[in-house]
Amino acid sequence: MGTEAEQPSPPSPPAQQQEQTNPPLWNAQNQKPARLYRLVLFFIAGSLAAWTIHALSNSNLVWKLRQLHHLPTAHYLQTRDEFAVYSVEELNAFKEIYDKSVSDSVGASYTKDEQTSINEALVSLRMAQDMYLAGKDDKASRLFEHALALAPRHPEVLLRYGEFLEHSQRNIVLADQYYFQALTISPSNSEALANRQRTADVVQTLDERRLQSLDSKRDALSAIHESNGALRRAKKEAYFQHIYHSVGIEGNTMTLAQTRSILETRMAVDGKSIDEHNEILGMDLAMKYINASLVQKIDITIKDILELHRRVLGHVDPIEGGEFRRNQVYVGGHVPPGPGDLALLMQRFERWLNSEHSSTLHPVNYAALAHYKLVHIHPFIDGNGRTSRLLMNTLLMRAGYPPVIIPKQQRNKYYHFLKLANEGDIRPFVRFIADCTEKTLDLYLWATSDLPQQIPMLIQTESEAGERLAQMQSPNVAQRSSILEFYESGSGALP
């Protein structure tokens, strides 16, 4: 019987080949630690990358939030309205970090000097309340003002001073402003919230009444025929006044007489810089452009604003005139948007200017908001204030109002109200523009009346003009009486 033959075994590979086929034991054992090291390094690198992206994202939000600190998102502040320069979607994206920043700022520690001022302010506040309860309102008022000067952003000081103004001084408008500021700083302050809920509707009604009274004066001025000699003289004088005060707000030292001389004769004034001359000539060019073109236009475009600015800086800086800035700028405590955001923000501003919603606003409110929006964006390297005031007056003129004169004597108030708008409350700035509008209307109505007195704006002595303007800053007795009767009635309805 045959058997299956055994297969010969394959020849053994050479020793060198066998070493390559079967690597040393120590190399195979070290593959697992090496693989583990790579995984750990990959995990660490991924974690660092994720943390870096998160940090950059948060830092970007914080940087943008610093620009948005004046745009409160809490509904009870009642200021999420047409003045915001960012969209609702963008504000919602910042809400979480905004709330965190508010809580952080409320609990922030103070420096030694700041804490000393706050302690002194609180002592003054307690003394003021004692004086008020004792019926010594004058002393109480001075102590409240001292406390506010020491701690202008302390919620308790703002709240108690507001209550004093509301109940003792019957100044509900200013009281409501302080309640608002207290809420902006401390959104959870229940007393400030309750006070504001009580005063908000009354103040809104008072503001509406004020705007209606401006319409009545505007209509009275419109009834005067253009051929009226006194009206023509008043317009000419107001033209000089407008340019003089607008450049004066920015620091121009020309007197009213010198400004008039430059505009009428085109002759240089001794002892004054070329730039000061050119600022006046630039305003003259811009005013003529408005009268010849913009007043008749239905819509105001970015190109129109650039053309306006080009004339404002045409003699001072023709290279930058009519061009958006290319650098970051800083205006006091306000940090305007970066140059990379200007194109988008100006496009939104243009849409808002010509929107159907804006057309429903009162002309003074609309013009003041446009002024604030543009000066907040701060699109130019220089001339933002002058251009914003010119745009404001363009919108007012289209609604039948004369160009508003903001007196240079009111420069500090003007900037103060812009600062309050940056902090969240646009209403004081709108009221300030309404005050200036009323004074300008009074200028024309007084000039065209049969009254023998000169009006404050037309007095040739500038010190007299400033003194008379200061007197007009406060409402007269009849106006105060009307406001008090309305508020004390408690009805909240117009009489």
Curated annotation (Swiss-Prot):
Keywords for this entry? Answer: ATP-binding, Hydrolase, Membrane, Nucleotide-binding, Nucleotidyltransferase, Repeat, TPR repeat, Transferase, Transmembrane, Transmembrane helix
Task: Give one GO term, molecular function aspect.
Answer: AMPylase activity
EC code(s) of this entry? 2.7.7.108, 3.1.4.-
| Cellular location(s) | Membrane
- Might you name a Gene Ontology BP term for this protein? protein adenylylation
Catalysis: reaction(s): L-tyrosyl-[protein] + ATP = O-(5'-adenylyl)-L-tyrosyl-[protein] + diphosphate; L-threonyl-[protein] + ATP = 3-O-(5'-adenylyl)-L-threonyl-[protein] + diphosphate; 3-O-(5'-adenylyl)-L-threonyl-[protein] + H2O = L-threonyl-[protein] + AMP + H(+)
Q: Which residues form the active site?
A: 378
In chain numbering, the residues marked as site (Important for autoinhibition of adenylyltransferase activity) are 250
Similarity comment: Belongs to the fic family.
Q: Which PANTHER family match?
A: FIDO DOMAIN-CONTAINING PROTEIN DDB_G0283145, PROTEIN ADENYLYLTRANSFERASE FICD
Q: What is this protein called?
A: Protein adenylyltransferase Fic
